[in-house]
Regions:
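N-terminal, charge-rich interaction modules
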Residues: 2-4, 8-43
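Extended, well-folded catalytic/binding cores that form a central cleft or groove in large enzyme
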Residues: 35, 48, 55, 59, ...
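Acidic, aromatic-enriched beta-alpha/helix-loop junctions
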Residues: 50-74
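Short glycine-rich, low-complexity/disordered patches
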Residues: 68-84, 121
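Helix-rich interaction surfaces within compact, conserved domain-sized segments
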Residues: 85-121
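Short glycine-rich, basic-tinged beta-strand/loop micro-motifs
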Residues: 34-46, 79-92
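A generic structural signal for short coil/turn motifs at secondary-structure boundaries
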Residues: 47-50, 95-96
Length: 121
């Protein structure tokens, strides 16, 4: 008997979670001179539980996959860390462990031709 939840359960749509839709882009702003700002909006406090952390990392990974796609290049041009940002708008009362985890994602994002920016709501 399996005791853990499957990835399908972990990442399924959950409107009650601070990251309700892991595989959807919350906001995309294509820039006039190329590139884009892709925003993740976390409007309620995000805890440091394993599920929340995994949902956040999967959402960033989903954005990075989009940035590396042909569809992104068609819409926004060639992505670079100078013209393409993932902006995490996070509730100011989110667990500090989440902010530490985000600080460790900068190199991962840069390696995938974008810049990670964290802003408080």
């Amino acid at each position: 008997m399996e005791t853990g939840s499957s990835d399908d359960d972990l990442y399924k749509d959950d409107p009650s979670h601070p990251i309700p839709y892991v595989f959807n882009c919350d906001i995309e702003a294509v820039l006039k001179d190329g590139g884009a700002d892709l925003s993740i909006v976390i409007a309620s406090p995000l805890g440091s539980d394993t599920r929340s952390l995994k949902r956040l990392l999967k959402k960033i990974e989903t954005y990075l996959q989009f940035i590396c796609s042909e569809g992104f290049r068609t819409e926004s041009g060639i992505p670079t860390a100078e013209n393409t940002r993932i902006v995490v708008h996070i509730h100011k009362k989110s667990d500090p462990a989440i902010l530490r985890a985000l600080s460790q994602c900068h190199e991962w994002v840069v390696d995938n031709n974008a810049k990670l920016v964290v802003e408080y709501l």
